[in-house]
Swiss-Prot record:
Taxonomic placement: Bacteria, Bacillati, Bacillota, Bacilli, Lactobacillales
EC code(s) of this entry: 2.5.1.6
Name listed for the protein in its UniProt record: S-adenosylmethionine synthase
Major localization class: cytoplasm
One Pfam family this sequence matches: S-AdoMet_synt_C
Cofactor(s) the record lists: Mg(2+); K(+)
Cofactor: record remark: Binds 2 divalent ions per subunit. Binds 1 potassium ion per subunit.
Binding positions for Mg(2+) per the UniProt entry: D18
Database matches in CDD domains: S-AdoMet_synt
Signal peptide (from-to): none
Subcellular location: Cytoplasm
PANTHER family attached to this UniProt entry: S-ADENOSYLMETHIONINE SYNTHETASE
Catalytic activity: L-methionine + ATP + H2O = S-adenosyl-L-methionine + phosphate + diphosphate
Involved pathway(s): Amino-acid biosynthesis; S-adenosyl-L-methionine biosynthesis; S-adenosyl-L-methionine from L-methionine: step 1/1
Length: 396
């Protein structure tokens, strides 16, 4: 009998407390960048019943009405009813933002490579905003070159939000979670979905029977291709039996607590740094996007079926301290050759990444729910496949 393996990933909806926090942080970032593209922002958010606290560091010439940004974001998510215990118009908003530390700013604004050097490359000016390691990943399991479990998990909660906002399922409330277990064959190819878990907040008068029916017919079967579902696929819909109290009324939320949901669902490694609320000088964010961009173009070029890219930086230094590529035995060329090609084609200094991916724009709020990678519903620069031909040529 051939060996088969299971792998599970989860996602959460835009109404999950941690995702509310992420979206508020990124909405503030976008509001600042729309006025001051060179701003340095590190905005953190905490949410709980009736309250939002925004704190962190911002260096900018922009004026942003934090109170309004917070309330507008909460309303867009769908928390507009006081019965939810968290409502856009009644929530207390408590901002506490200060200027970025000058000790950090001096390394970001003038990288080690240019200090005392009159003949400087302008792209050497920006040093990494912190030390750290970042990963990017791609695999040929889906058209968007993402692992199937996280791809399906995101699509399930996004479908729930669509049905809620359109009014097609009127009893749905904003908070929800999904989890998908995929069975892989001996060649690491996905063959079927073994288990689907969906927990969705609902009005108190909704019955378990109608929730179960609607979620299976209008969500699961609408999202998961029929080829992956069979009579052995298990469905767990609101397995606690009731999910009326949710969102920040049921659980507090913080920016940066869903980093695995934001990336590859645990299928690839993660350096530990969160994304939301951070401008692109923070390599936690920008280098993770660059690493995904590299990995996706490698797989799209047919140079590997699976690729993981690690980048690492020292604070205040422009050039990465390391670049590593792992193709897990699926590569068509040596990994050392791929690394040389990547160094040649991709400028991995923070300023180079910002220029390459045009990251000074206010594009981040849209990434703060349903994943930063593999998005097919929005146009993100790190998802482009414009380096495929250059990579093919470089490894000849």
């Amino acid at each position: 009998m051939s060996e088969r393996k299971l792998f599970t990933s989860e996602s959460v909806s835009e109404g999950h407390p941690d995702k509310i926090a992420d979206q508020i942080s990124d909405a503030i970032l976008d509001a600042v960048l729309s006025q001051d593209p060179d701003a340095h922002v590190a905005a953190e958010t905490a949410v709980y019943t009736g309250s939002v606290h925004v704190f962190g560091e911002i260096s900018t010439t922009a004026y942003v009405d934090i109170n309004r940004v917070v309330r507008d974001t909460i309303a867009e998510i769908g928390y507009t009813n006081t019965e939810y215990g968290f409502s856009a118009e009644t929530v207390g908003v408590h901002p506490s933002l200060v200027e970025q530390s000058p000790d950090i700013a001096q390394g970001v604004n003038e990288a080690l490579e240019v200090r005392g050097n009159a003949d400087q490359d302008p792209l050497d000016l920006i040093g990494a905003g912190d030390q750290g390691l970042m990963f990017g990943f791609a695999v040929d399991e889906t058209p968007e070159l993402m692992p199937l479990p996280i791809s399906l998990s995101h699509k399930l909660v996004r479908r729930l939000a669509e049905l809620r906002k359109s009014g097609e399922i009127a009893y749905l409330r904003p908070d929800a979670k999904s989890q998908v277990t995929v069975e892989y064959d001996e060649n690491d190819q996905p063959v079927r979905v073994d288990t689907v878990v969906i927990s969705t907040q609902h009005d108190p008068d909704a019955t378990n029977e109608e929730i179960h029916r609607d979620v299976i017919e209008k969500v699961i079967k609408a999202v998961i291709p029929a080829q992956y579902l069979d009579d052995k696929t298990k469905f767990f819909i609101n397995p606690t039996g009731r999910f009326v109290i949710g969102g920040p009324q049921g659980d507090s939320g913080l920016t940066g607590r869903k980093i695995i949901v934001d990336t590859y669902g645990g299928y690839a490694r993660h350096g530990g740094g969160a994304f939301s609320g951070k401008d692109a000088t923070k390599v936690d964010r920008s280098a993770s996007y660059a690493a995904r961009y590299i990995a996706k173009n490698i797989v799209a070029a047919g140079l590997a079926k699976k690729a993981e890219v690690q980048l690492a930086y020292a604070i205040g230094v422009a050039q990465p301290v390391s670049v590593r590529i792992d193709t897990f035995g699926t590569g068509t060329v040596a990994e050392s050759k791929l690394q040389e090609a990547v160094r040649q084609i991709f400028d991995l200094r923070p300023a180079g990444i910002i220029q390459m991916l045009d990251l000074k724009r206010p594009i981040y709020r849209q990434t703060a729910a349903y994943g930063h990678m593999g998005r097919t519903d929005i146009d993100l620069p790190w998802e482009k496949l414009d380096k495929v031909e250059a990579l093919k040529a470089a490894v000849q």
